[in-house]
Amino acid sequence: MSQRRISVIAPCRNERAHVVAFCDAVAAQELPEGVALEVLVADGMSDDGTRDLLAQRCAADPRFAMIDNPRRIVSSGLNRCIERARGEVIVRMDLHTRYESDYIVECLAALDRTGAANVGGPWRAEGEGATQEAVAAAFQSRWVTGGARSR
Protein backbone atom coordinates (compact mmCIF):
# COMPACT_ATOMS: atom_id res chain seq x y z
CA MET A 1 0.00 0.00 0.00
CA SER A 2 1.48 3.32 -0.98
CA GLN A 3 1.52 6.25 1.40
CA ARG A 4 -0.23 9.53 0.78
CA ARG A 5 2.29 12.31 1.33
CA ILE A 6 1.25 15.67 2.75
CA SER A 7 3.54 18.70 2.57
CA VAL A 8 3.07 21.42 5.17
CA ILE A 9 4.60 24.71 4.08
CA ALA A 10 5.12 27.73 6.32
CA PRO A 11 7.00 31.00 5.86
CA CYS A 12 8.64 32.74 8.80
CA ARG A 13 11.05 35.46 9.84
CA ASN A 14 12.10 36.23 13.41
CA GLU A 15 9.49 33.94 14.97
CA ARG A 16 11.49 32.73 17.95
CA ALA A 17 8.50 33.22 20.26
CA HIS A 18 6.26 31.01 18.10
CA VAL A 19 8.43 28.47 16.30
CA VAL A 20 8.54 25.76 18.98
CA ALA A 21 4.78 25.80 19.63
CA PHE A 22 4.13 25.71 15.88
CA CYS A 23 6.46 22.75 15.33
CA ASP A 24 4.96 20.91 18.30
CA ALA A 25 1.43 21.50 16.97
CA VAL A 26 2.30 20.23 13.49
CA ALA A 27 4.16 17.21 14.88
CA ALA A 28 1.10 16.38 17.02
CA GLN A 29 -1.35 16.36 14.11
CA GLU A 30 -3.60 13.28 14.07
CA LEU A 31 -3.01 11.74 10.68
CA PRO A 32 -4.77 8.75 9.18
CA GLU A 33 -2.82 5.55 8.70
CA GLY A 34 -0.85 5.63 5.49
CA VAL A 35 -0.29 9.39 5.49
CA ALA A 36 3.31 10.64 5.56
CA LEU A 37 4.07 14.22 6.56
CA GLU A 38 6.84 16.57 5.52
CA VAL A 39 7.10 20.05 7.04
CA LEU A 40 8.93 22.73 5.06
CA VAL A 41 9.59 26.00 6.87
CA ALA A 42 10.96 28.84 4.74
CA ASP A 43 12.98 31.08 7.02
CA GLY A 44 13.57 34.66 5.86
CA MET A 45 17.10 34.72 7.30
CA SER A 46 15.95 35.30 10.88
CA ASP A 47 18.42 36.89 13.26
CA ASP A 48 16.55 36.34 16.55
CA GLY A 49 17.38 32.66 17.17
CA THR A 50 14.54 31.23 15.07
CA ARG A 51 17.01 29.49 12.76
CA ASP A 52 18.72 27.77 15.68
CA LEU A 53 15.41 26.47 17.00
CA LEU A 54 14.38 25.28 13.54
CA ALA A 55 17.74 23.57 13.04
CA GLN A 56 17.28 21.74 16.34
CA ARG A 57 13.83 20.54 15.29
CA CYS A 58 15.10 19.45 11.88
CA ALA A 59 17.90 17.46 13.51
CA ALA A 60 15.48 15.80 15.94
CA ASP A 61 12.63 15.10 13.51
CA PRO A 62 13.41 14.17 9.89
CA ARG A 63 9.93 15.26 8.78
CA PHE A 64 11.02 18.90 9.25
CA ALA A 65 13.23 20.86 6.85
CA MET A 66 14.33 24.49 6.94
CA ILE A 67 14.53 26.25 3.60
CA ASP A 68 16.39 29.52 3.21
CA ASN A 69 14.34 32.45 1.96
CA PRO A 70 16.96 35.13 1.26
CA ARG A 71 14.37 37.49 -0.28
CA ARG A 72 12.57 37.60 3.10
CA ILE A 73 9.19 37.90 1.38
CA VAL A 74 6.30 35.60 2.33
CA SER A 75 5.42 34.73 -1.28
CA SER A 76 9.07 33.94 -2.08
CA GLY A 77 9.27 31.65 0.92
CA LEU A 78 6.07 29.87 -0.05
CA ASN A 79 7.33 29.43 -3.61
CA ARG A 80 10.61 27.95 -2.36
CA CYS A 81 8.66 25.50 -0.21
CA ILE A 82 6.36 24.55 -3.09
CA GLU A 83 9.41 23.87 -5.30
CA ARG A 84 10.69 21.39 -2.69
CA ALA A 85 7.34 19.88 -1.69
CA ARG A 86 6.89 16.20 -2.50
CA GLY A 87 3.33 15.84 -1.24
CA GLU A 88 0.27 15.29 -3.38
CA VAL A 89 -1.43 17.78 -1.05
CA ILE A 90 0.12 21.02 0.19
CA VAL A 91 -1.13 22.47 3.48
CA ARG A 92 -0.18 26.10 4.06
CA MET A 93 0.21 26.96 7.73
CA ASP A 94 1.48 29.92 9.72
CA LEU A 95 3.64 30.12 12.83
CA HIS A 96 1.38 32.66 14.53
CA THR A 97 -1.63 30.36 14.33
CA ARG A 98 -2.80 27.77 16.83
CA TYR A 99 -4.06 24.57 15.23
CA GLU A 100 -6.33 21.86 16.56
CA SER A 101 -4.77 18.40 16.37
CA ASP A 102 -7.24 17.38 13.66
CA TYR A 103 -6.66 20.39 11.39
CA ILE A 104 -4.85 18.51 8.63
CA VAL A 105 -7.12 15.45 8.73
CA GLU A 106 -10.18 17.72 8.49
CA CYS A 107 -8.66 19.51 5.49
CA LEU A 108 -7.95 16.15 3.82
CA ALA A 109 -11.51 14.99 4.49
CA ALA A 110 -12.90 18.18 2.96
CA LEU A 111 -10.72 17.72 -0.13
CA ASP A 112 -11.84 14.11 -0.53
CA ARG A 113 -15.51 14.89 0.17
CA THR A 114 -15.81 17.89 -2.15
CA GLY A 115 -13.22 17.35 -4.84
CA ALA A 116 -12.24 20.99 -4.36
CA ALA A 117 -8.79 22.21 -5.35
CA ASN A 118 -8.42 24.30 -2.19
CA VAL A 119 -9.96 24.04 1.27
CA GLY A 120 -9.47 25.65 4.64
CA GLY A 121 -11.20 25.95 7.93
CA PRO A 122 -12.65 28.82 9.87
CA TRP A 123 -10.23 30.89 11.89
CA ARG A 124 -10.41 33.39 14.67
CA ALA A 125 -7.96 36.27 14.97
CA GLU A 126 -6.61 37.01 18.43
CA GLY A 127 -4.25 39.71 19.60
CA GLU A 128 -2.05 40.59 22.51
CA GLY A 129 -2.32 44.21 23.57
CA ALA A 130 -4.63 46.98 22.42
CA THR A 131 -3.34 47.37 18.87
CA GLN A 132 -3.31 43.66 18.06
CA GLU A 133 -6.72 43.20 19.66
CA ALA A 134 -8.12 46.01 17.48
CA VAL A 135 -6.68 44.41 14.35
CA ALA A 136 -8.10 41.03 15.41
CA ALA A 137 -11.53 42.57 15.94
CA ALA A 138 -11.37 44.12 12.48
CA PHE A 139 -10.55 40.76 10.90
CA GLN A 140 -13.65 39.30 12.54
CA SER A 141 -15.88 42.11 11.29
CA ARG A 142 -18.28 41.33 8.43
CA TRP A 143 -17.72 44.88 7.21
CA VAL A 144 -13.97 44.32 6.82
CA THR A 145 -14.11 40.76 5.47
CA GLY A 146 -17.14 41.17 3.25
CA GLY A 147 -18.89 38.31 5.01
CA ALA A 148 -16.25 35.70 4.18
CA ARG A 149 -17.38 32.36 5.61
CA SER A 150 -13.83 31.40 6.61
CA ARG A 151 -13.85 33.99 9.39
What are these regions (language model features)?
Residues 35-45, 67-70:
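Short beta-strand/loop segment that forms part of the nucleotide-sugar
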Residues 24-35:
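Short, acidic, metal-binding catalytic loop of nucleotide-sugar glycosyltransferases
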Residues 17-20, 48-56, 102:
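Acidic helix N-cap motif at the loop->helix transition within catalytic regions
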Residues 98, 102-133, 137:
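Conserved donor NDP-sugar-binding/catalytic core segment of glycosyltransferases
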Residues 5-7, 38:
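Cell-envelope/extracellular polymer assembly enzymes that use nucleotide-activated donors
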Residues 25, 43-52, 94-100:
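A conserved acidic beta->alpha catalytic loop
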Residues 69-85, 106:
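Glycine-rich, basic loop-to-helix element that forms the pyrophosphate-binding segment
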Residues 90:
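Short aromatic/hydrophobic "clamp" motif used to bind/position activated sugar donors
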